A protein has these predicted regions:
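Cell wall/extracellular polymer interaction/catalysis modules
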Residues: 29-207, 215-224, 229, 240-249
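Bacterial Sec-dependent N-terminal signal peptides
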Residues: 1-32
């Protein structure tokens, strides 16, 4: 049989083609990897945009601007709420409560929102800590005995009867910002130093750091909030906005 001898140049070309092919495949894998990473980033951005759009929709439908709620307070509240809900931290995800400390203490700055039925359940006064400020709260702390309010997200727990009557325990969800809430006995309770009868004063009565509500509405508020709902205490703090793990998660 006659043997066919390949030209040296052709053989060399074949060798080069077989050498190059694996490199091209490796580059393809890198391209796929980068695509997956980029898609993940895009998905995260989409999630944030969706949460903000939902928050704005709720804000507009319920006309929360007419009740004095800051639009930023609502946007941040809903974003963190979504993070907690997705983590399974909320036993009751139907209710979201926003405390807007950008407002005067003489304003009704607690908003209890029924997300399931799309309505405001209650809007009332809420006290800030005595060392957080007079009419406006502007100092915040997570330190025991500071007598200041703490910013951020909380998950409500069970109730108990204490020196202020029916009270609601709170679990702070943000390390360094409010995770000492239980150690500090920061709870929702009723108080006679806050309410309509104090509106004409220079400022409402203040607490030792608790988000206290008017005594006559304490039972109603606590029963709406108890057992695993989300409570968010807001103030326009750039440091908190940058450091919050729930806002930046």
């Amino acid at each position: 049989m006659r043997k066919t001898i390949l030209p040296i140049a052709f053989a060399a070309a074949l060798a080069v083609s077989f050498t190059v092919s694996p490199v091209e495949k490796a580059d393809s894998k890198k391209a796929i990897t980068h695509t997956i990473v980029n898609n993940s980033s895009a998905a995260a951005s989409t999630t944030v945009a969706t949460a903000e759009a939902t928050a704005l929709s709720i804000y507009e439908r319920l006309e929360l601007d007419k009740l004095g709620l800051s639009v930023d307070a609502m946007k941040y509240a809903y974003k963190g709420y979504e993070q907690l809900r997705e983590k399974g931290a909320l036993a009751n995800s139907d209710v979201l409560t926003v405390v807007d400390f950008s407002q005067s203490s003489r304003k009704k700055r607690m908003y209890i929102i029924d997300l399931k039925n799309d309505k405001v359940l209650f809007n009332t006064y809420v006290a800030h800590g005595k060392n957080s400020g007079l009419d406006y709260a502007n100092q915040f702390s997570n330190t025991p005995e500071s007598l200041q309010s703490s910013l951020g997200f909380y998950v409500t727990k069970g109730t108990y009867s204490g020196k202020h009557g029916l009270s609601l325990r709170l679990s702070g969800q943000e390390k360094g910002w409010n995770d000492n809430a239980e150690e500090r006995a920061v709870v929702v309770h009723g108080a006679n130093y806050i309410g309509d009868h104090r509106v004409s004063s220079a400022y409402m009565g203040r607490s030792f750091g608790c988000p206290a509500v008017p005594q006559e509405y304490a039972e109603k508020v606590i029963n709406l909030l108890k057992d695993g709902t989300c409570l968010f205490i807001y103030h326009p703090s750039s440091r908190y906005e940058q450091e919050s793990t729930l806002l930046n998660g």
